[in-house]
Amino acid sequence: IALTIDSKFVRYCAVTIVSILENNDPKDIMLHIVSGHLPKEDVLTLSQVAEKYGTSIAFYYIPHEKLQNYEVKWQKQRLSMVVFYRCVLASILPSTISRVIYLDSDTLVLGSLKELWDTNLNQLALAGVQDTVSPNPSYFERLQYAPSYNYINGGVLLLNLAYWRKHNIEQQCIKYYQQYPDRIILNDQD
């Protein structure tokens, strides 16, 4: 399971981790925390939470330069770069990891993640759940795609990292972001 955070979200992430491990078998869970930088005390806090359940966390750090292609929108809205870390998971996580569940670090997991994990991606880049605002026609008009594609919640995803790597999805995200910045209002959600 991959979570992306900065120091402001450590306490929320700790709650997310507890909710994951309380509702799933900890021995089946490997946690991947991706951040720009975390102070040692934050790393220790999250590690101690995981250790209480007999699991561990791998920490990955993304250099600021890796995400410079996205910065125009961040600067306009003063958002943290963390919102785009999920777009680069395929190049950050080890190549031996072919799929990963991505969760926003303020997600409360109330049940098993097994059904999501077992989802057959059939050569798809990702699977997600329909967002509650999906019926809003303006989203589809702005993004210029058919409503039949649905609008998914970007905070709970099953990512096919092997597909992302093979088809250069990370670069496609960057290219789309650079070509159509005015279409992307909800940032990583779009």
Language-model segments: what does each one mean?
Residues 107-142:
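Conserved donor-nucleotide/metal-binding helix-loop-beta segment in metal-dependent transferases, i.e.
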Residues 127-135, 149-190:
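Catalytic core and acceptor-binding pocket of nucleotide-sugar-dependent glycosyltransferases
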Residues 10-24:
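Histidine-anchored nucleotide/phosphate-binding helix
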Residues 100:
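Short aromatic/hydrophobic "clamp" motif used to bind/position activated sugar donors
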Residues 1-3, 20, 30-33:
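Hydrophobic targeting segments
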Residues 43-47, 95, 110-122, 170:
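Short alpha-helix within the catalytic core of nucleotide-sugar-dependent glycosyltransferases
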